[in-house]
Design a protein with these regions (language model features):
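Structural preference for solvent-exposed beta-strand-turn elements
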Residues: 1-323
Length: 323
């Protein structure tokens, strides 16, 4: 066998996209200077977990990480897919961080993909699993992905800091994608959403729905927000609550906003076991519903911060696919 020629890259920017494109194009990459000047240099736990996930769904994939984690080599293999796979995503980032590149790779695998992901289903950093199911999967259908076999099942929920959620992702294989020209966002014609609560009173959900309807009912009549209260093992390991909203437009575009309220992770600046004051459920419903009806051109960091009185716990989803 000949010597492997690696394409050299620097830094940790857009790491998921780099790994996705390297895998699809079968291009070995070597990434250097990963946070080399930070107080905590090297790959983060969720980035290492993503590399291990790529190993799990691929055949003949090779990952080599140096001792400090500031450099790694990634030689992609053949994406095989497969059924009954299981991966623990950890609690550094939510499952949505892994779902976005995983669903693309699953489309081009040798076999249909069925994988169980464990970890955090809802947080304030990544798109929650409800948003992914309500917006990302229908978006893929616009590119010719069949609805048969494309499914995300939420079996239990988990929020920071300890997670405990589980989802089951199923992705069919395709031969090619259909090109799409899509420049008109259209006008909002209906709004769907879901609230959730884990290890807290279900009254939090009713309060969020009441606040959201206070905005939506003045604009359009077709609004349905469902509740999903979890208890027992399906409620994960930490208390929390949140909401996911999807506004569908006349052109088939999906405008989404979601958030989850829970106690902070230790790496988010909180102390393990420290009881912080949580954002009131009424404010959650009001702010997220306001973000959901923003024009898509205003979904930028500056606009989100200006309209976000918390400065941290709400996001309008652009995510992996962007705009």
């Amino acid at each position: 066998m000949g010597k492997v020629s690696y394409k050299k890259l620097r830094g940790s920017q857009n790491l998921r996209q780099r790994l996705l494109l390297a895998t699809l194009s079968a291009t070995p990459v070597q990434v250097e200077d990963i946070r080399a000047n930070d107080m905590m240099p090297g790959l983060r736990p969720h980035e290492v977990s993503l590399l291990r996930l790529l190993e799990k769904i691929s055949d003949d994939c090779v990952v080599k990480i140096n001792e400090t984690g500031t450099k790694f080599q990634y030689k992609p293999g053949i994406v095989m897919g497969g059924r009954h796979l299981v991966h623990d995503c950890g609690v550094s980032r939510a499952i949505g961080y892994f779902l976005e590149p995983l669903v693309v790779l699953g489309l081009f695998s040798k076999k249909p993909l069925s994988i169980r992901l464990k970890g955090i289903t809802n947080d304030s950093k990544d798109p929650c699993v409800d948003t992914f199911r309500s917006a990302t999967l229908p978006l893929l259908k616009q590119f010719g992905v069949p609805s048969e076999g494309l499914e995300l099942k939420i079996e239990s929920r988990g929020v920071p800091p300890h997670g405990g959620g589980e989802v089951l992702l199923s992705v069919p294989i395709i031969q090619s994608l259909t090109a799409v020209t899509w420049i008109d966002e259209g006008m909002v014609k209906r709004i769907r959403g879901v609230t959730f609560s884990t290890r807290v009173s279900s009254q939090f959900e009713n309060t969020m729905i009441h606040a959201a309807r206070g905005i939506f009912n003045r604009l359009l009549p077709d609004v349905h927000i469902f509740t999903d209260h979890k208890a027992g093992q399906q409620a994960g390991n930490s208390p929390g609550y949140g909401i996911s909203l999807v506004a569908e437009t006349t052109s088939g575009c999906f405008i989404t906003a979601d958030t989850a309220v829970s106690y902070a992770r230790a790496d988010d600046g909180g102390m393990e076991g420290e009881k912080q004051e949580l954002v009131p459920a009424e404010d959650v419903g009001f702010v997220v519903s306001s973000l959901c009806i923003m024009p898509p051109r205003c979904f930028k960091d500056s606009c989100r911060k200006a309209s976000n009185p918390w400065n941290r716990n709400t996001k309008a989803h652009q995510g992996f696919f962007g705009c």
